[in-house]
Structure formats: C-alpha cells, structure tokens
From Swiss-Prot:
Secreted growth factor that mediates its signal through cell-surface proteoglycan and non-proteoglycan receptors. Binds cell-surface proteoglycan receptor via their chondroitin sulfate (CS) groups. Thereby regulates many processes like cell proliferation, cell survival, cell growth, cell differentiation and cell migration in several tissues namely neuron and bone. Also plays a role in synaptic plasticity and learning-related behavior by inhibiting long-term synaptic potentiation. Residues 141-168 are annotated as: Disordered. Residues 147-168 are annotated as: Chondroitin sulfate A binding. Keywords: Disulfide bond, Growth factor, Heparin-binding, Mitogen, Secreted, Signal. Residues 92-99, 123-131 are annotated as: Chondroitin sulfate binding. Interacts with ALK and NEK6. Interacts with PTPRZ1 (via chondroitin sulfate groups); promotes formation of homooligomers; oligomerization impairs tyrosine phosphatase activity. Forms a complex with PTPRZ1 and CTNNB1; this complex inactivates PTPRZ1 protein tyrosine phosphatase activity through PTN interaction and stimulates tyrosine phosphorylation of CTNNB1. Interacts with ITGB3 and ITGA5. Forms a complex with PTPRZ1 and integrin alpha-V/beta-3 (ITGAV:ITGB3) that stimulates endothelial cell migration through ITGB3 'Tyr-773' phosphorylation. Disulfide bonds join 47-76, 55-85, 62-89, 99-131, 109-141. Residues 1-32 form the signal peptide. This is Pleiotrophin. SMART domains: PTN. The lineage of its organism: Eukaryota, Metazoa, Chordata, Craniata, Vertebrata. Its main location: secreted.
Length: 168
C-alpha cells in the first residue's frame, strides 16, 4: 500500500510532465505555422553616387532654398531629385554661402593701402561644398563708431526737449 504523501507527489509529477509535453507541442506547432520566406536577392546598385549642386535660395541670398541632385547608371529608377536646403543668413557669402569660417581679430591699419585685414580658417562646409581652407578679407581703416556715452547724452537731450514741450 502507498502512502498519501507518495500519491500526492506522483500526481504533481504527472501534472508537471503533462504541462511540459503541452508546451513542447505548442512550440512545435508555432514553428510549423511559420512559412519560410525565400531570401531576397541582394541587388547591387548600378547607380553612381549622388552629385549635388549648390543650394539656391528661394528668395534673397540666404534662407530656405533647393538643390538639384543627379546620378548616373543604366538601371537607376531615379537619376535626378530636388532636395530642400538652407543657407545661414549670418555667413559671409563672398566666400561661398555653404562655407563657414572662423576669423581672427582685425590686424593693424596698413598706411599704404588704408585697409585692415584679417584671416579666416575653414570651420565647416555644408553638403561637401568646395571651400578654400583659408580666406582673407579687408576693410577701410579709421571709421570710428560712436561710443555709448554719446548715445546716452543724446537720450538726455531728447528727454529734456520732451519735458520742455510738456511745460509749454
């Protein structure tokens, strides 16, 4: 005769075994249900690299614009496309709108030419633009800007005139 403890253990083992068999059957069915997809053939592109034109602003000489791209290839679906682009308005356009330079301080005034010069080194080029590594710019010497104290004295004069008009 078997003890009740032994029978209880046997029932638990049988239940665990049946659960294990059920899980195996479910996994096998799920794998059988999956269809084997034929591998896609990797098609090597006969197309060349995209070559992009410079960014042409929609209006003015900076801001939003477009650029044209072309590529070669006998079996290319697309050989031309247009892309939106942007030319920053704070860049010096005389060196190319897609080239950003880091400039040094202005040099001393050359008395022979009456010009100051400074040099800029290339900081960044947009869209693989063809930019010079260094550039030099010049400007006339001697034009002094108005200092802040003069501007403050003008404000005081205007305020004084306003008060005189109010008194009249």
């Amino acid at each position: 005769m078997q003890t009740p403890q032994y029978l209880q253990q046997r029932r638990k083992f049988a239940a665990a075994f049946l659960a294990f068999i059920f899980i195996l059957a479910a996994v096998d069915t799920a794998e059988a249900g999956k269809k084997e997809k034929p591998e896609k053939k990797v098609k090597k592109s006969d197309c060349g690299e995209w070559q992009w034109s410079v960014c042409v602003p929609t209006s003015g000489d900076c801001g939003l614009g477009t650029r044209e791209g072309t590529r070669t290839g006998a079996e290319c679906k697309q050989t031309m496309k247009t892309q939106r682009c942007k030319i920053p308005c704070n860049w010096k356009k005389q060196f190319g709108a897609e080239c950003k330079y880091q400039f040094q301080a202005w040099g001393e005034c050359d008395l022979n030419t009456a010009l100051k010069t400074r040099t800029g080194s290339l900081k960044r080029a947009l869209h693989n633009a063809d930019c010079q590594k260094t550039v030099t710019i010049s400007k006339p010497c001697g034009k002094l800007t108005k200092s802040k104290p003069q501007a403050e004295s003008k404000k005081k004069k205007k305020e004084g005139k306003k008060q005189e008009k109010m008194l009249d």
